[in-house]
Amino acid sequence: MGLSDGEWQLVLKVWGKVEADIAGHGQEVLIRLFKDHPETLEKFDKFKNLKTEDEMKASEDLKKHGSTVLGALGGILKKKGQHEAEIKPLAQSHATKHKIPVKYLEFISEAIIQVLKSKHSGDFGADAQGAMSKALELFRNDIAAKYKELGFQG
């Protein structure tokens, strides 16, 4: 299920564009996640009170958390599948502290793909979308395996 070198190049090329405005991308990803899957908002005590898209856009905390999420994901993507050291603490915190189900990781993966499609259509064609989908699936599968080791049925 690994990616080819060419697929990793496509992933990292578009990710460079994400990193140029990580806060903006992170904010958009979280807003899309919360709009498309409102149940995910319940996992975020800090954001539960944000009811409208305008409130979400005005939240510095949401923008900051979006940067944190995409920053961590970027670090994982740059490892090109050799991300054991990065995945382990992330799975630990998301299983034991935050209790984030794998399904929610699927939801945020969808949000990432949609945001990249809307912001970078010229650099995110079918090949790049397919490569990013595979990379995010690899990430989710590895998180799910760690969840299982930890006894979390997320």
From Swiss-Prot:
Catalytic class of the enzyme: oxidoreductase
Q: What GO biological process terms are annotated to this protein in UniProt?
A: removal of superoxide radicals
Q: One cellular component GO annotation, for this chain's record?
A: sarcoplasm
- Limits of the Globin domain: 2-148
The keyword Metal-binding is assigned to this record = yes
Which residues lie in coiled coils? none
Q: Which residues bind O2?
A: 65
Gene3D superfamilies (UniProt xref)? 6.10.140.2100, 6.10.140.2110
Q: What is its EC number?
A: 1.7.-.-, 1.11.1.-
Q: What residues bear Phosphothreonine in this entry?
A: 68
Which reaction is recorded as catalysed by this protein? Fe(III)-heme b-[protein] + nitric oxide + H2O = Fe(II)-heme b-[protein] + nitrite + 2 H(+); H2O2 + AH2 = A + 2 H2O
Q: Which residues carry this modification: Phosphoserine?
A: 4
> Which PANTHER family has this protein been placed in?
MYOGLOBIN
Quote the protein name from its UniProt record: Myoglobin
Q: Whose protein is this, by species? A: Sciurus vulgaris
